[in-house]
């Protein structure tokens, strides 16, 4: 399969109910990159106890305007948890911004956090600490093993859906009610 137009890039992966890995149980992960070399995603619904204000203080960024609740912080995945990735929908005027899909933008440069601290950043954002990574062929095998559902992403689901509703809402986008799926298959 050619990965140039990967069907998984910019999709949401919804963990199936039987997912036992605590990093991904009931998770929804936005696939930022997918190629023959592997995949990278950001988990959207794993809130952390650290606030954006704490992150800004740790980075010695002076806060002039306290960040609103519309700037949420999550554990983006188990890889490089000290790295930050900002998903947002505002213009790409920051140093390291990549347009994704449905008006979403990914920024990895410090200047977006500095802009948020002075009230000039995007209106809302999801700050992801770390990311989810898959080696070549690993994600494809997990899909074959029925570990994930794939569903289209939307800006609203990524940035606005309450964390506790994200898993069910993402599955519902393709008509799946997760409460009706068994965690184990029976064998006769």
Curated annotation (Swiss-Prot):
GO terms for cellular component: cytosol. Belongs to the UPF0301 (AlgH) family. It comes from Alcanivorax borkumensis (strain ATCC 700651 / DSM 11573 / NCIMB 13689 / SK2). It holds the Pfam family DUF179. This is UPF0301 protein ABO_0112.
């Amino acid at each position: 399969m050619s990965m140039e137009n990967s069907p998984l890039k910019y999709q949401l992966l919804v963990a199936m109910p039987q997912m036992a890995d605590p990093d991904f149980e009931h998770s929804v992960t936005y696939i930022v990159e997918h190629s023959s070399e592997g995949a990278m995603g950001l988990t959207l619904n794993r809130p952390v106890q650290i606030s954006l204000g704490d992150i800004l203080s740790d980075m010695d960024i002076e806060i002039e305007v306290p960040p609103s609740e519309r700037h949420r912080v999550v554990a983006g995945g188990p890889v490089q948890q000290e790295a930050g990735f900002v998903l947002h929908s505002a213009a790409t005027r920051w140093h390291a911004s990549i347009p994704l899909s449905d008006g979403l933008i990914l920024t990895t440069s410090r200047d977006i956090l500095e802009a948020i601290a002075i009230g000039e950043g995007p209106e809302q954002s999801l700050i992801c600490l770390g990311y989810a990574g898959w080696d070549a062929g690993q994600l494809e095998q997990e899909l074959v093993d029925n570990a994930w559902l794939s569903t289209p992403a939307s800006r609203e689901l990524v940035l606005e859906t309450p964390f506790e509703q994200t898993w069910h809402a993402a599955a519902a986008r393709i008509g799946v009610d997760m409460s009706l799926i068994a965690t184990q298959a029976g064998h006769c």
